[in-house]
From Swiss-Prot:
Superkingdom, natural source: Eukaryota
Documented effect of changing R110A: Reduced binding affinity to laminarin by the N-terminal domain. Reduced binding affinity to laminarin by the N-terminal domain
Keywords: Glycoprotein, Immunity, Innate immunity, Secreted, Signal
Activity relative to temperature: Denaturates after heat treatment at 100 degrees Celsius for 10 minutes. The N-terminal region (18-198) is thermostable and retains its ability to bind to curdlan after heat treatment at 100 degrees Celsius for 10 minutes. The C-terminal region (199-488) is heat-labile after the same treatment.
Subunit composition and interactions: Monomer.
Signal peptide: 1-17
Effect of L64A: Reduced binding affinity to laminarin by the N-terminal domain
Binding residue positions for substrate: D72, W99, T100, Y101, R110
Region feature Binds to laminarihexaose and laminarin, mapped onto this chain: 24-127
UniProt protein name: Beta-1,3-glucan-binding protein
Biased composition annotated in UniProt, kind: Pro residues: 141-150
Glycosylation sites: N373, N453
UniProt cross-references to Gene3D superfamilies, sorted A to Z: 2.60.120.200, Beta-1,3-glucan-recognition protein, N-terminal domain
Species the sequence originates in: Plodia interpunctella
């Protein structure tokens, strides 16, 4: 691959020569040594369609060779094109030799003969790291007359202040530690080791009008997870909605229940839409922390993004959100609702308590127009909600969510007395990313809605209105660029 790429660059150089290089100057690359390990290289976005980084550690490049690092980046993040090596452990005095390449307006441009020396370390967020324990000079090179011994590369671990965050399976974690990172840069869904796909008919408490499947609904594309809603008939055959569908062989729900097998009967047709959902339920669960997700929400009538924290064990009950749910980002796909962003906990299935604790931010534009950074900070004494770095709400339990639930006649609020002041949000939760359609709780009945929430023909009436809602699904994907979890 890299031989082909270098030949391509050579051709560009021959064809356009120095005059083209004078027409555009590639922005200088910013290199950062991440503490305790890692390298980040970035340039500001200037309308590029590709950014490539090629470099060597402590060894000069031989012309336009591929180097130890050779990576093509096809998508910017947060206004910058970024290459990241999370495993390399750099030392003060280390030198990186490199060249970069960009494609702008269909033409290629290089920045050659780059050199950079490690003089300091930074944290993940770019702030200076505490280097009081670092060596102040580069390791002394071995002279030819000295025994050929390896140069020490170990640096003392930084001081650790134990965090309130807890990770299932670990004794303790340090404050500010990056605990979980998914950049979705794998080639295949099977390579997502920390996630498992749902295959089932979702049921209570919201009874959405979709079935979770894998084929055609979950894809990795240009470093993002893409979840796509599709009509069930497109996967099977016309008339499938009045037939039976058995998912038992791959079902992630409870076998021998309607979560895994459905038989249509009269107005009770099969869910007409198939979508995707993945979770870390059996891979990564935690209690308290900062969750950051960069995503582009779906646009289209009756579509609902699922960027959530869900309870691992349903300690306080498995119905009606008795054990809670936390929404990192939630905006309905209908154009009339799309400027309203909501985030926070859901502790009951019905209104008014269902939405009482959710925070709202009205956007200048629809939230589904572009990618945004959504953050939920889950603490021992409350929850903070942020979007693009701006806080738009805080949720405090006060004397406990039980008191508020009892005030609103929530029948299961008494269960929370078994926990702390944050109950039911004081247990282990997992990450979930999915796409839902319709359902019986998220959309209030109105003249424009084709179904009534309490009607036994809700799914059928929704399906019969497809000529109105399906044409609005021209940008219906939920796209997730990354998911990160940090210790408090």
């Amino acid at each position: 691959m890299f031989v082909t790429f270098i030949c391509f660059l050579a051709c560009l150089t021959c064809s356009y020569g120095q005059p083209r290089a004078q027409q555009y100057v590639v922005p200088s690359a910013k290199l950062e040594a991440i503490y305790p390990k890692g390298l980040r290289v970035s340039i500001p976005d200037d309308g590029f369609s590709l950014f490539a980084f090629h470099g060597k550690l402590n060894e000069e490049m031989d012309g336009l060779e591929a180097g130890h690092w050779a990576r093509d980046i096809t998508k910017p993040k947060e206004g910058r094109w970024t290459f990241r090596d999370r495993n390399v452990k750099l030392k003060l005095g280390d030198k990186i030799y490199f060249w970069t390449y960009v494609i702008k307006d269909g033409l290629g441009y290089r920045q050659d003969n780059g050199e950079w020396t490690v003089t300091e370390f930074v944290n993940e967020d770019g702030t200076p790291a505490d280097t009081s324990l670092e060596p102040t000079t580069a390791p002394t090179p071995v002279r030819p007359d000295q025994p050929n011994q390896p140069i020490p590369t170990h640096r003392p671990d930084p001081p650790c202040t134990v965090s309130a965050t807890m990770v299932d399976g670990r004794k303790s974690v340090c404050q500010g530690t990056l605990l979980f990172s998914e950049e979705f840069e794998k080639a295949n869904l099977k390579d997502l080791a920390n996630w498992e796909a749902e295959v089932k008919f979702p049921e209570e408490p919201d009874y959405p009008f979709n079935v979770y499947m894998v084929d055609g609904t979950l894809e990795l594309e240009d470093g993002s997870l893409v979840l796509t809603p599709k009509l069930l008939e497109s996967r099977f055959h016309a008339g499938i909605l009045n037939d039976a569908l058995d998912l038992t062989n791959r079902c992630s729900g409870q076998v021998d229940t309607t979560e895994c097998r459905r038989q249509a009967s009269g107005a009770q047709i099969l869910p007409p839409v198939m979508t995707g959902k993945i979770t870390t339920k059996n891979k990564f669960t935690f209690k308290f922390g900062r969750v950051e997700v960069r995503a582009k929400l779906p646009a289209g009538n009756w579509l609902l993004p699922e960027i959530n924290l869900e309870p691992k064990d349903n300690v306080f009950g498995s119905r009606r959100y008795e054990s809670g749910l936390m929404r990192v980002a939630f905006a309905k796909g209908n154009a009339v609702f799309a400027k309203k962003l909501n985030g926070g906990p859901v502790l009951a299935d019905t209104e008014p308590f269902r939405s009482l604790l959710m925070k709202e931010k009205i956007g200048i534009d629809n939230w589904n127009r572009d990618y945004h950074n959504y953050t939920l900070i889950w603490k021992q004494d409350g929850i903070d909600m942020l979007v693009d770095g701006e806080k738009y709400g805080s949720i405090s339990p006060g004397e406990g969510f039980y008191a508020l639930g009892r005030e609103h006649a929530v029948p299961h609020a008494a269960h929370w007395l078994r926990g702390s002041v944050m109950a039911p949000l004081d247990q282990y939760f997992f990450l979930s990313l999915g796409l839902r359609v319709g359902g019986v709780h998220d959309f209030a009945d109105s003249p424009d809605k084709p179904w009534k929430n309490r009607s036994n023909k809700a799914v059928l009436n929704f399906w019969n209105d497809r000529d109105n809602w399906f044409p609005t699904w021209f940008d219906a994907n939920l796209k997730v660029d990354y998911v990160r979890v940090y210790a408090l």
